[in-house]
Amino acid sequence: MRKPSITITTAKAIITPDYTLIKSHSKYQLPSRFQKLDADSPERSTVVKLFYRRFMRLKPFISNVKMVKDTYRDYVRYKFMKENYELKRYLVFNPDGLRSKIKLELLSNTKCCERIVPVTEMQRTLEFVLKSCSYLPETKVQKWDIARDNTYCRQILKNLLTMQYEKYRSILHRGIGHDELDVKFSHLKTTSSPLTKLNKTEKKKIPLFKVFSDFDTTLIYLNETLGTRL
């Protein structure tokens, strides 16, 4: 049975049974381009809040599933408030034998408020999420390249949120601490200890750590390619 063809028009949107067309995009897009800001810039807090609000406003468009929207919300909060991306990136690009203890300590001890705001990367990330929320049918009549690009963004974001949800599940039900995965990035640190020296709990973590390590490594390389901070 076909859905009734009902169109609802409001001041902000046009809504059909299948799609929602947002009339005003200003609160989802940035008003202008910004220069890269350092930790001491007086505008730093304003710019961070501006980006944060726009990412959060996109939550209703991420998915119709509450679990997915909640995972997106938690991930955005983590990215802005806790993640030490430079440490994560350093661990990916520097194998175990090439890592400097001094560099690791310096990166690990850098507070969130002291880190440089990567404005260009954040802009591209916002554009990426906007594309993932936008729909165009992939037909010859439409601009196929744009439609396909949006589809790629949507699929990548879906996979990212699925993996992040698995991390949350591992923290809650599989005995893996939040600090291990999201603060210290233990899954990105290879161990030279033989299996015989690991206890039972540590051995159980190895398969999960391998999955999370492969995904986060791929994500870092994707960010380097696209200039984003997913």
Swiss-Prot record:
GO terms for biological process: ascospore formation. InterPro entries: Irc19 (IPR016613). Keywords: Sporulation. It comes from the Eukaryota. Involved in sporulation and maintenance of the mitochondrial DNA. Is probably involved in a pathway contributing to genomic integrity. Belongs to the IRC19 family. This is Increased recombination centers protein 19. It comes from Saccharomyces cerevisiae (strain Lalvin EC1118 / Prise de mousse) (Baker's yeast). The lineage of its organism: Eukaryota, Fungi, Dikarya, Ascomycota, Saccharomycotina.
